[in-house]
Swiss-Prot record:
ATP binds at residues 14, 172-174, 238-239, 247, 253-254, 270, 274. The gene is metK. Belongs to the AdoMet synthase family. It catalyses: L-methionine + ATP + H2O = S-adenosyl-L-methionine + phosphate + diphosphate. It is an enzyme of class 2 (transferase). Keywords: ATP-binding, Cytoplasm, Magnesium, Metal-binding, Nucleotide-binding, One-carbon metabolism, Potassium, Transferase. Its EC number is 2.5.1.6. Pfam families: S-AdoMet_synt_C, S-AdoMet_synt_M, S-AdoMet_synt_N. K(+) binds at residue 42. Gene3D superfamilies: 3.30.300.10. This is S-adenosylmethionine synthase. Residues 98-108 are annotated as: Flexible loop.
Amino acid sequence: MRKLFTSESVTEGHPDKICDQISDAVLDAILDKDPNGRVACETAVTTGMVMVMGEISTKCYVDIPKLVRETIRGIGYDRAKYGFDCETCSVITSIDEQSVDIAMGVDEALESKKGEMDKLDAVGAGDQGMMFGFATNETKEYMPMPIEMAHKLSRRLSEVRKNGTLPYLRPDGKTQVTVEYENGKPVRIDAIVISTQHGPEIYLEQIEKDIKEHVIKVIVPSELLDENTKYFINPTGRFVVGGPQGDSGLTGRKIIVDTYGGYGRHGGGAFSGKDPTKVDRSAAYAARWVAKNLVAAGVADKLEIQLAYAIGVAKPVSISVDTFGTGKMTDEEIVSIVNKVFDLRPGAIIRDLDLRRPIYKQVAAYGHFGRTDIDVPWERLDKVEEIKKHI
């Protein structure tokens, strides 16, 4: 049976991704000085303006406007002709402390109040909600091919802009990849869409030629392309006005880009700007860690795990697994292995993945999962042998 599946990615200069990176830059700066700081930082950008808001409880001081300008400069918006300039944009901040009602549930979990606890039971989940983790062995990164390929193309767009290969490119851009599957396995790429911001002096014909030569051919294995593969490069014909001048942006608007490109489910909670007591982030990272190690151990070819939490309660209220018919054992048996090998209380996740560190801005663009260019703890295959003992 054949089917097509499509996923998209965006570059670091996309307005929503600018916001994610600013929010995580603030988080990293606080965790660097105060590992126990509580952060929920949201950012909005529009023409000539950045607004940073949220709830932050910390003992340290960070210069938020300076962080904002440094982040925007690093992305590449460093001159007025780009329509957004790190030096001249206004930066507005509105920061409150974390609600005492939320803090009391995180500081002392329900298990602690009832006296049924060890030390890790003392940290309650920062919110209710459900989080999903996913892994598949169809790529070496244990990620679905459509999102993995889209991210690589987006990263390459930024690379050729910054290293001067294509100096007329500007920071904003999007990619989209359609993969054809046969009997559940990726066999070819059916379509590639790339929209990249550019200077007004360049013509579409040159952009199409350069993107095929310096981006697509460098990233996509030739065996996945054929004479029927379709290419759509700047299909509107012109993309000069971009970034916050073209569209306003908000933190948390690219949650599917951040995860599995729609191939796996999403619980709805965004990641960026949130410290690890927020299970939206830490439990989603843990779920990916669990799923990847299970697939690498040979438990299934494809696996999705759902975790669910109640605010102020340490232990997950539910854990469920779906192997889509690829499991080497029942889903119930896999859940039993998960409970034996992994401790999924928020305090244990923070400990085991060492999450109270400034490691978040680096994943705020080009995906939080499947990253081989950086070392992030939830991508480590450190539980495979222990899982195999229970198979």
